[in-house]
Amino acid sequence: NILKLKSFGYKIIGPEIGDMACGEYGEGKMTEPNEIVNTLKNYFSNLDKNKKLKALVTAGPTNEYIDPVRFITNKSSGKQGYEIAKCLRDNGFDTTLISGKTSIKPLDGVNFVSVETAEEMFKESLNNLPTDVAIFSAAVSDFKVKNYKSTKIKKNEEFNLELEKNIDILNHISNHNSLRPKI
């Protein structure tokens, strides 16, 4: 599939060969964020500056609530997505950043949407289509709580946590031709 995409002229960034997050060595290591940003800067600096293109970026973690005060999440600072959004903005894109909760302040000149859950991120992503460029860099929770409790679970209360799969935002959007961004 990668060879097919390359034959259509798509630029593929990564994966690299090296030590991966799972502790194994091989192809699958994430490309360094600075290299991703530099590749994007080079690509976008060669585009026609007279045409205003739209860009959508997701960043940060999503939280899936167990009860009103507890949640499961994927750890993410959001820095990579914010830097990508900044790069797109600086290259003249009308940029929307959909972000989970981070300590980073919203960027000037970027349309900012704050979300908490994967479902919210999915809905906001759909609301911001069509777009010319979409970069899904958020650490979206793969699972959500099946048996959410609307009141705080007491510490002496028995509770079994059941999970179910969350929607795969990237997969959903990239597999629907009417939604799929050009980049």
List the predicted regions and their residue ranges:
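Electropositive phosphate-/nucleotide-binding environments in soluble metabolic enzymes
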Residues: 27-34, 74-78, 82, 115-119, ...
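Glycine-rich phosphate/diphosphate-binding loop of Rossmann-like nucleotide-binding domains
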Residues: 3-7, 49-117
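General beta-strand structural signal in soluble alpha/beta enzymes
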Residues: 12-15, 97-99, 136-137
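Short glycine-enriched, charge-decorated loop/helix-capping segments at active-site entrances
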Residues: 26, 70-75, 154-159
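Short glycine-rich anion-binding loops that position phosphate/pyrophosphate groups of nucleotides
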Residues: 18, 60-64, 138-146
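Internal gly/pro-rich beta-alpha loop/helix module
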Residues: 1-44
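Short amphipathic alpha-helices and their capping/turn segments at secondary-structure boundaries
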Residues: 5, 37-55, 118-134
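Glycine-rich phosphate-binding loop
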Residues: 116-183
